[in-house]
Amino acid sequence: MSDAYTAAWKASIDDPQGFWLDAAKALDWAVAPEAGWTEADGWFPGGQLNPCHNTVDRHVAAGRGDAAALIYDSPVTGTIATFSYSELLEEVGRVAAMLASLGVSKGDRVVIYMPMVPQTVFAMLACARLGAIHSVVFGGFAPHELAKRIDDATPKVLLTTSCGIEGSKVIPYKPMVDEALRLARHAVDHVVLFQREQVTAELAAPRDLDWMELREKTAADAIPACVPVASDDPLYILYTSGTTGTPKGVVRDNGGHATALAWSMANIYGIGAGDVFWAASDVGWVVGHSYIVYAPLLVGATTVLFEGKPVGTPDPGTFWRTIDRHGVKAFFTAPTAIRAVRKEDPDAKFLSEIGTGQCQAIFLAGERADPDTIGWLEDKSGLPVIDHWWQTELGWPAIASCVALGDLRRERGSAGF
């Protein structure tokens, strides 16, 4: 083990209160916390902050407004777009103004049923800005599954798009939203729909509103200020898959979650301001919440939002092409994705031709990573492949090698050890 890793481990064991209070200094707090953790009050009691301020506003205020915040890479539409932190602030602020005009405020719930498009990220951060609680539902979930989540979260507003794109298949969302709302006992006040060029959805007034028309209608409204929330106030509700029964809503806090994410970016993934991080997941899952949206932006990094598949969009070289094109420093994906790439390109011809650019490590999670898959990826890429473990209920890695602390220990088939 490295000296840096040993020192960090010892500090966390000898003085956990001090260790996590020190980690919390990576954030801007409206009111500083009184302690790191107490059994009665949880993480950072007394502390108040706003996650949108910490992911967006503070970087602009620090003079990094021109730095790239979000890269949208969509091979299914042939679109690549980059949003600076200043542009992200404007987009998030406009969505926050839209939601505020519909009466959304601190503590209200907003269901987001959207695919991998920038507007999904804008919506999540806009909710956080207002102190509202977002509940992102994986785009394309069947109406009865969406209805269950609507009934549990009881949202004031539902945000959606006219369609999602899965590989070469365009999936209209509005019919599924309409059916879900018909099945649900809870009635939302409004549905706000972003029209994509692939499908134009019909809207039913007065419930349904066009995203861009509402944006134009509220264009003169001031961007709402970031609302401070208590450390243990909810940031979001994310439902487990429901494979073992009724989906269970995991309620994520603000202060502890943000502190853990910022610490993990710096110490597990080795990512800081100006670096490019790519988690090849979906915002409908916990990896997307934590490591597409919140964690990279908390540390001022650039995050990649990828609307595509490991293979077929257009070929098994799409991962390596995206890594090389955007200068990705650390890449996070699931073992299943690598197995799909290997099946289509067993000799890694695309990887050999394209390379891995500036990438320094590949991280795997989401399921068991079999030693054979890890070995193939390490041998073909020449990069350390870090298998680490966590789950929806945790929100960040519980078992991992801390790459930035010089801890590259790994045994194939054993996550984080």
Regions found by a protein language model. Name each.
Residues 52-53, 70-125, 142-147, 207-213, ...:
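Conserved AMP-binding/adenylate-forming core of the ANL superfamily
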Residues 77, 157-231, 344-347:
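ANL superfamily adenylate-forming
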Residues 301, 329-332, 342-410:
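Gly/Ser/Thr-rich phosphate-binding loop
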Residues 114-115, 135-151, 163-172, 282, ...:
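ATP-dependent adenylate-forming carboxylate-activation enzymes
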